[in-house]
C-alpha cells in the first residue's frame, strides 16, 4: 500500500513535470522564432538620417519586407532626381571594404540599396531604399508600396549610391532594406514625371517698376527694378508640375551674388513651389506635394531685377521684359551709372564685381584713368574699412593695362580681363611696386600715370561681420613747371559698400473638391514685412542670397557724408541668420484720482512692418559706387515673408519719455533708459492726495516679507478697493521714488512721528553695484496741534541685508504722510522698515522689486482708533492653476523650515500675523524669478506638497527608480540587433524539431497523469 502510494506520487510528479517542461519548450521555440524574424528584418527610422538595417537569411525561409512600417510612420511619395554618378560604393558584411561598381549594373546580386541625397542643409530625414536604375536628369517618383519576396536570399550585400541633387530641392533622404526579389520588382514601380503647366497659368496682374515706382534705375546707388506678378492657376495641379517665365538678358536676379536663387512660393509657412534659375534668363517654379487636391490656387511674386553690367555698359534707356505663357510684361527704364570721382588730372572709379558669402570672399575692379597733364608719384591703395580680417590671408591683386580708348571704358565698371585685345596684364612688371597685407589691403606705386590701369582685387572679409566697406584711394602729384608747386598733391577716394535686398513670394489655395457646407479653406496669412531705408552713403552695393528656413536680422546704420573730397560713412547690411529675438518695451501708467490704473501700454515687435527709407547718395557732392548684392530674394522697399516670424533689430540704446496727467493735472515724467547690459530703469510715481477727518490713530504697517517693496498711502475717497502697481524686472535695477498723500485738518491729540534714516535701512545687494536711494521722510505738518509734538529718528542699524549677486542697494522710503485734520486722539504713523528682517540671498542674476499701493481708500469721519495695515503677502488662493512650472525651479525643494508646509490649510491669513512671523516668507523667496508676474508662489505650490517634509523624498524616489530601470532595460535591446550574424537563428528545421520535442513531452506528461488517475481509482 505504501509502495503504491509512493509510486503514484512519483508518477504524478513526473507527469506534471513533463507537461510543464513541454509547455516551456513550445513557448520558448515560439519566442525564438519571433526573435529570428526580428533579426531577419530590423529597420529603424531616425531623424538625423542614420539608419540601422540588419538582415539575416537562411536557405529555405522566404521573407517579406517591412516597408509598410515606414509608410505608417510617414506616408508620402519621395521625389528624387537621379544624375549620372561614378561614385558607387559597394560594401559587404563579410568583407567590409569598398568595391567600385557601375551604377547601371544588373541587380542580380544586389540585396540592399541605399540612396543618399546630398543636401545643403541638414534636415529631419526619413529613410527608404530604391533600386538603382538608369541615370536620368528628369525627376521621378518612387512608390513606397511594400513588395513581397518570392526568391531565397543570397549572400548579403549592401550597395550605397550617393547621388547629387540640385540646390533648389529639399527632399528627405530615404533608406530601405530589401532582398533580391524586391530589387527586381522595383523596376515596375510607378514613375511620374512633372508636367509643364505654364499654359495653365493666367497672369492677372504683371508689372515692372523702377526704383521707388519711378522710371529710373541707378545701379551704382544700389537701385534695382522689381517684377511683380499675380498669377492664377487652373485646377488639377500635382506634385512635380512646373511653370516657367523668361527675363530679358539685360537684367538678372542675383546682382553680384554668386548664388543663383529665387524665392519659394509659400502659403504662410507651407512651401507650395520651389524656384530655380535656369540658363537664358529662364525662371522655373516646381510645385511640391502641398499642391495636391488644391483648387483656386493663386500666387504673388515680387522678384528683384538687377541691371546686368556686362550687357548694359553705358547710360541710356533699357527695355526690360518678362514673358509668361506668351504674355509679355515690359517696362522702359532709364539706366544711369556714376562716373566715379575725379579732377582735372585723373579719374578714379570702382565697383564690387562678385560677392561670395559662403566663402567670405569678394572681388573688386578699379579703373585709374589719367585726364590731362602728367601725374607723377602716384600711389593707389585698397583697404577694407569695414569687415577686415586682421589674421586673414593676403589678397590676390592683378594689374592690367587698358589698350582701348578711354572713351570706350564701360560706365558700368565692367572689365573682361580675358579679352587680350583690350587688356594686357602687367602684374609681373609691377611686382616690385605692389605691396600686399594680411588684413586684405594692398598698395601700388606708379611712377608716371600716363596710361589707364585696371586693378582687379580678390580677397576675403571677416566672417560674421555686418558691414563690408572697401575703399580705393589714389594720391598723385601733377607735374609742375616750377618745383615750388611740386608739393601740391591731390587725393581721390572711392568707397564701395553693400546693401542686401530680399525677394518675396506667396500663394494660397482651397482644398478640393469643394463639398457643400464645407467651409474649410487652405489659407494661411502670409506675414509681410515692408523694408524701406535711406542710405546717405555714396557707394552702396546690393547683394541677394536666400537661405532656407531662416529669419531676418537687420542691422542698420545711418550713413554720414564726410568732407575732404570723399564720402565716408557706414554701410547698411540686411542679412539672414537663424537666430532671432523680440524686444518688448512697456510702460505702466500712473494712478489717477479715482484710484484705478490709468492705462497700460505695451509695444512689442514681432513680424510687424519695419519701415526705413532708402536713398543712397542723393544730393552728394562726390559719388560712390554701388554693387548689387541680394539676400533672401525679397525686394527692399517691398515685403518679406519669414517662417519663424521673428525680426531682430540691433540698436545702440533707446531712450524714451512717457508723460501722463494725474488728478491734479500735474505732469509726471516716467523716464526710462534701456540698455543692453545694465537694464537700468528709473521710475518716479506720485500718488494722489488724501482728504478727510481721521479722529482715531492712523497706523500704517508695511511688511516687506520676501519681496523688496514699499507702499504709500492711497487716496481716501470712500472707496474700499485696492490699487496695486507692480514693477517686475528681471536682471535689472529699479529705483523707486514715492511721495505719500497728505491729510488736511486740525490735530487735537499728541502727534508722534518716526523717521527712519539711511543708517537703519536694509541693504540690497545686486551685481556689485551699490545704489543709495534717499527719500524725503520728514513729514510736513499743518494745522492746530494741541498735543505734544515728538519726532523720533531711527538710524540705520541692525537692519538686514538683502544679497542679490554682490550688489548693495540702500532704499529709504518716504513713509510719513502729511497730516492735516481734526484728530482728537493720539495719532501714530508707523512704518515697519524691515527691522530685524531675515536675510535673503539670491543667485545674483534675477531680482524682483514690487511697488504696491495696497491701502484702502477711506473717506469720512472715524470715531475710533484707526489702524491701516498692509500685508504684501497676497492671500492664499488654493485653486490657482499654474503650479506645474514652480517645481521646475531647482531651488524649490530648499525650504529649511517646516513652518511653510504646516500652514497651507489657512484660507486667509489675518493681517496681524504678517509682522509677527517675519521668517515665514523665507522659503518661497527663490521662486520669485520663476514667476515674475505672479507673486503668490507659496500659495500655489503648497496645496500639492505633502504636509510632511519627509514625504517629499518619497515622491522623488520613484523617478530615480524608473530611470534606473530604463537604463537596465536599454542594454538588453542592443545585443538582440547585433546577433544578426548567427547563421542558424530563425531556421525552420531547428524550430520544428524543438516544438515537436516539446509536444512529445507534453503528451507523455498527460499520459502519465491519466495513468495516475486510473491507479487511484483502482
Curated annotation (Swiss-Prot):
Annotated region described as Fibrinogen/elastin/tropoelastin-binding, given as residue ranges: 194-511
- Where do the segments described as Ligand-binding A region lie? 37-511
Q: Which InterPro entries match?
A: Adhesin_Fg-bd_dom_2, Adhesion_dom_sf, Fibrogen-bd_dom1, Fibron_repeat-bd, LPXTG_anchor, SDR_Ig, YSIRK_signal_dom
Q: Which residues carry this modification: Pentaglycyl murein peptidoglycan amidated threonine?
A: 985
Which stretches does UniProt call biased (Basic and acidic residues)? Answer: 112-126, 827-838
Q: What happens when the gene is disrupted?
A: In a double fnbA-fnbB deletion, cells adhere to host (green monkey kidney Vero E6 cells) but cannot invade them.
Q: Which GO terms describe its cellular component?
A: extracellular region
Map the B- repeats onto residue numbers: 545-574, 575-604
2 X approximate tandem repeats: region residues: 545-604
The leader peptide range reads 1-36
Q: Where is this motif: LPXTG sorting signal?
A: 982-986
**Record region (Disordered):** 38-61, 78-195, 595-622, 740-813, 827-997
Q: Where is the composition biased (Pro residues)?
A: 875-938
Region: 4 X approximate tandem repeats; residue ranges are: 745-878
Does Manganese appear among the keywords?
no
Function according to Swiss-Prot or TrEMBL: Promotes bacterial attachment to multiple substrates, such as fibronectin (Fn), fibrinogen (Fg), elastin peptides and tropoelastin. This confers to S.aureus the ability to invade endothelial cells. Promotes adherence to and aggregation of activated platelets.
Tell me what this protein is called. Answer: Fibronectin-binding protein A
